C-alpha cells in the first residue's frame, strides 16, 4: 500500500512540475509581450489560460524530422533521458509529505545534474554534424565549469549550517 501511495505521489509531482513549466512559459510570454508593447498570448480564452494546452497540442501534432546521417536511436533517446533526469531532481526536494527519504539528497541532486552533461554530449555527437558536435562540447565545458562552482557553494552552505 505504501508503494502505491509513493507511486501516486511521484506521478502527481511529475504532472504538477510539467503543468507549472507550461504556465511559467505563459508568464514569460506575457511579460515579453508587455515589455515589447504588443498584445501577447492573452487573447486565447480567459486571460490566455488555454494557451499552454494549445501549445502542447501544436507540439504533438508537428511533423518529426531528423538528420539523414544521424544515429537515430541516440538522437532521440538523449533528450528523453535529459527530461527524466530533470524530473528525478524533484524527487529529492523536501516537501510537506515526504515522498522519498534521502539522507544524501544533495549528493543525489549533484549526480542527477552532472549526468545531464552526457545527454548534451550524446545529442551533439549523434547528429553526425561537426557543428553540432562542437556546440555540444562547448555546452559540456560550460556545464562542467558551472557545476564545480555550484558544488562548492552547496558545500559551503552545508559547512556553515553545521557550525
UniProtKB/Swiss-Prot annotation:
State whether keyword Transmembrane applies: yes
Q: Broadest EC class?
A: translocase
Alphabetical list of InterPro entries matching this protein: NADH_UbQ_OxRdtase_su1/FPO, NADH_UbQ_OxRdtase_su1_CS
> May I have one GO cellular component term?
mitochondrial inner membrane
The keyword Electron transport is assigned to this record: yes
Which Enzyme Commission number(s) are on file for it?
7.1.1.2
Q: Which GO terms describe its biological process?
A: aerobic respiration
Q: Which Pfam families match?
A: NADHdh
Domain of life, per the record? Eukaryota
Q: Which residues cross the membrane?
A: 3-23, 77-97, 104-124, 143-163
| Keyword terms of this UniProt record | Electron transport, Membrane, Mitochondrion, Mitochondrion inner membrane, NAD, Respiratory chain, Translocase, Transmembrane, Transmembrane helix, Transport, Ubiquinone
Molecular-function GO terms, alphabetical: NADH dehydrogenase (ubiquinone) activity
**Which reaction is catalysed here?**
a ubiquinone + NADH + 5 H(+)(in) = a ubiquinol + NAD(+) + 4 H(+)(out)
Name where it's found.
Mitochondrion inner membrane
Recorded topology in the membrane: Multi-pass membrane protein
Its biological purpose is as follows:
Core subunit of the mitochondrial membrane respiratory chain NADH dehydrogenase (Complex I) that is believed to belong to the minimal assembly required for catalysis. Complex I functions in the transfer of electrons from NADH to the respiratory chain. The immediate electron acceptor for the enzyme is believed to be ubiquinone.
Q: Could you say which protein family the record assigns here?
A: Belongs to the complex I subunit 1 family.
Could you identify this protein by its name?
A: NADH-ubiquinone oxidoreductase chain 1
Q: Which organism is it from?
A: Drosophila algonquin
